[in-house]
Amino acid sequence: MTETAKRPLYVPHAGPSLLEMPLLNKGSAFSTQERIDFNLQGLLPHNIETIEEQTERAYSQYNLCNTDLDRHIFLRSIQDNNETLFFRLLEEHLEEMMPIIYTPTVGQACQEFSKIYRTHRGLFISYPDRERIDDILRSATKNNVKIVVVTDSERILGLGDQGIGGMGIPIGKLSLYTACGGISPAYTLPVVLDVGTNNPDLLNDPMYMGWRHERVSGAQYEEFVDLFIQAIKRRWPNVLLQFEDFAQTNAMPLLERYKDELCCFNDDIQGTAAVAVGTLLAACKAKGEKLSEQTVTFVGAGSAGCGIAEQIIAAMQLEGLDEAQARRRIFMVDRWGLLTDDMSNLLDFQHRLAQKRADLGAWGGQQGDDLALLEVIRNARPTVLIGVSGQRGLFSEEVIRELHSHCKQPLVMPLSNPTSRVEATPQEILNWTDGQALVATGSPFQPVQVGDKRIPIAQCNNAYIFPGIGLGVIAVRANRVTEGMLMAAANALANCSPIVTQGEGAVLPALGDIREVSKRIAVAVAKQAQAEGKALHTSDEVLNDAIEANFWFPRYRAYRRTSF
């Protein structure tokens, strides 16, 4: 416990209003003296409980829920009533509850957002209110915001346009910043930019709570986002802004436009890339190989897939390859087949990842020929297969067996979310490779039994990366998030892998260890920020103390009454 946590907190609120503040409410844990000082006598049952007793009751209530969506709603209701209790409950049951508060259950919660809505959380900034964004930000109840997660809800997981229902993603992401990275919930703010929706189900739903209008696009959209960014810079100039679940047509341009203007990153592009590269590095270390020796095939060439590919290329260059050599080891397969330089429909960020058809030799065919996934596997002979397509079943038995025929221990990463969109299940992949493949998935899966072996499945979850990035940025007050910082995070994650540290187990650490993993990532990120001049340099001792000081634990502090 830090010295700050031991000191009393001076609180100017009292009575029912105090009980209605999730960041301050202790419920039945208010002491006798606090009940007197804060005019709470008679507003709570007589018995005074510890947080351990409250957590036990909450968990027993949680177990009465019948469905995962019911469990999600229950946990969110606790969060909206008592954040300390919510995060204590998560701390004690993180592996069990993480799939409930985030993927895959959060996908359904986003789809049902208007139907299950209970109370406000975060900010809803709609296009019709674009001239009042400064006023909206000033109305936020949190003054010392250090991390904002913002979405426009156009590409929620693999579910597409969910309108304001996408707010479930920033809420869930920030819950993980706290549960996994120790970021105080007092420092976090979820935001949804309501620019309308093109989802006809929502437009025709009488219960839909968002702006009932087709999506704003083009120059109007860009102007609106810029109004938001500039207002954020005025309100919280040192904030870390995370872009979340923007469509690929906007995600990369927004990142490129603002990455040198404020401290920001896109988790779908850069966070996904960092955890994927960390997974690859761990697998390579375990096999005694180099990343630069691998050949990687992607299924899905959107912004997430291309972001991963670019970071792999950068990592290969750090191992000695030149850029051209590294790019020749990356094969991007999309709905039209392998991306090649003679295609006329490539997006801007895809051009640099397209293979030169002339370099493919006989199997490259003629200009205009589509090269399907199986053909790419058969001829490129990859050692790594990554799925970010959102299409169930694309990793067929024929594809996986072909992959295994030339690579004894391939790394297969079906990363699409939610579970219903995964390219292949771990059970299928391991059955088709005689239990030899290394598997990491985007959604959580139970261990797989293959013969007499029980094989744990690593969830290639961005939660291994972004909480540590946030903690490191906050600890040293970094003013930017750089590619070097993301690479430092990936390397730190790889060094925590059980198959690296113990020679067996999953490719990634157990979720139960994620808070310690986040601290190690925070140290690596902070040191890299200092090395690049993005933060003031300190000694290692001062840096470690700063990380510990910023690491919040869900414990109640004693309260003292004060006036405004």
From Swiss-Prot:
UniProt-listed Enzyme Commission number(s): 1.1.1.38
Catalytic function, reaction form: (S)-malate + NAD(+) = pyruvate + CO2 + NADH; oxaloacetate + H(+) = pyruvate + CO2
Positions annotated to bind NAD(+): R155, D268, N417
Keywords: Metal-binding, NAD, Oxidoreductase
Cellular component GO terms, alphabetical: cytosol
Catalytic site: Y102, K173
Note accompanying the cofactor annotation: Divalent metal cations. Prefers magnesium or manganese.
GO biological process: malate metabolic process
GO molecular function: malate dehydrogenase (decarboxylating) (NAD+) activity; metal ion binding; NAD binding; oxaloacetate decarboxylase activity
Required cofactor(s): Mg(2+); Mn(2+)
Disulfide bonds: none
Chain positions of site Important for activity: D268
Subunit structure: Homotetramer.
Official protein name in the record: NAD-dependent malic enzyme
Source organism of the structure: Pseudomonas aeruginosa (strain LESB58)
